[in-house]
């Protein structure tokens, strides 16, 4: 599900780092400071007369923000009308957000002029814009109005922190900060009002049952929200099955708004169910029970499709494993594979899933306060890392029992405990319903989505399983509306699609004889970054036209080495030492930017090609072989591809491919290394990319050893890694990367000539 808290942030990202400081500005000490409103108003007033007018639309958009923050509300309303006279928003989301801000400033103008209270004026504005809309448009606009201020507040706090030591800000920085403040002010003021207004509007559109109870095959119960369009005949149902409870009614309502029965069912134990909450374990059978229940209802035409992402993507595969007859199609996005990509990623436990357990299991509803307690979880990671205790000690350090996480630690292999949760091997052959999967190059669920896709096609060559992938994040375009800018990278206009719109177009095609979405013209549909173009292929392998082998060659300097077609000499190697006992890097933060000014080679080596003479396109997954000698029985490795741009910036090309070498060949069976003996380990990256590299760019492959405070640390003894401690780090890891290491790069254009 898409967190509402992100909708408002999407259009108000803060741009920091501009060199010119045109406006003196002393940032308030915190977002809670009573000085914030006046400081923002003063900054807006000073920016109004100096903001450039070279582009009329850009100027008017900026002027609206400045006038609103300066409390010139009537002027801001006039400016919005001027904007509408010369421009139409380029996306549904932008149109909706602009209506939210316009409604807000008009209500504030009424309050300021003493013609009405803010509550009264805003309520009238809200009803006026929502009443004439059809169900889909009313749903989208209501969703925009419902944006939660929590993450906007967090972003505002971070922005003030960045400028805390500065004496001034540039015009662009000031405008970004003021846009963020306007979003925070707007959604903080309207949030207490919107829920009741939307509920009032919903009553004339939908039949809503927020607590349907369904009996499972073993006698337990699960609860569900059911939303139907008023006056509708029997309809197909679109269902989500989830451990998350926030926004359940809205998710079901979205499907009802598009002419389906919307059902949002919960993992047993959530909502009104009295059973224990156990993530993953019973969702498949319980989802099957809900599907059978739906098919028996008088409002159902007997056809059920599933949708949703992340955990809600996993539950679709869990349900399909059991092949309920009423389940006619699934559309999983950014799907999780329990035991394979969460809470373990290819053998490595990730700390981020430790707070996820209380978030989803401590209460009947999502425990947002606990999950968002960054201070608690950051302290846990830091304390554990500095102490060098075993991974099992997280529970003791945190001071709160976590029997579920303890249970997960008992299953480090992809064993029967995990295998029974989703289709496994030959079970994929029996899944013969249409499947549409979506994910992103920068989606943390990328690995899981590609696992399902490749296994389904492997065991069922005739599988009707289609993939859509582009430059998307987990909560952005992989599941929802694409971002415009993602962690510094400006997404191509062609890639800015709305996965929810695709969802309903696809289900209309399957269930209502609508046209097939044009985007789905082949099995693999991918956007090529930098080319602003979608390509289509029959398979992942056919994304590219050629594969070129590049060898991880000799060292070029500190943490740098050559990547080239030339086979290195037999004695070529690169030595690396990682001291697992050294925790002086405790304040190191892994880079999050997709586009950045430098490459962080922490515990890694960057292998780089010579600059390309011609524009060069890479489409698909890297594969290759790592050839090395190490003094340990096991190690954890990370591989990330980058483009070093001609201007010296670095663009990350995909999500990180990280793995434990002992589980790379077979996730269900650990195979240790022999210290001091040469190892050659083939790999196929579980992450893919598509990017047109410009002439003058280099391909850079960052190969790193995992050692960080937010992941399990593999000390290499060969014992269960959860039992290892810093006492096992007496001898640093010493690895010699040998010259027969290589990667096979999937090019569309020949590397050397640039020919097609």
Which residues are covered by each model-predicted region?
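Active-site-adjacent alpha-helix of alpha/beta-hydrolase-fold enzymes
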Residues: 447-466
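Accessory cap/linker subdomain of secreted extracellular hydrolases
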Residues: 134-188, 197-200, 257, 321-430
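Alpha/beta-hydrolase fold nucleophile elbow
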Residues: 298-311
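Short beta-strand/loop motif that positions the catalytic acidic residue
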Residues: 431, 437-439
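A catalytic-pocket lid/entrance helix-loop region that shapes and gates access to the active site
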Residues: 307, 314-381, 441, 460-504
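C-terminal, loop-rich substrate-recognition/catalytic regions characterized by aromatic stacking residues
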Residues: 385-389, 477, 482-756
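N-terminal cap/lid segment of alpha/beta-hydrolase-fold proteins
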Residues: 193-233, 612-614
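Cap/lid segment of the alpha/beta-hydrolase catalytic domain
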Residues: 229-296, 478-491, 645-647, 658-659, ...
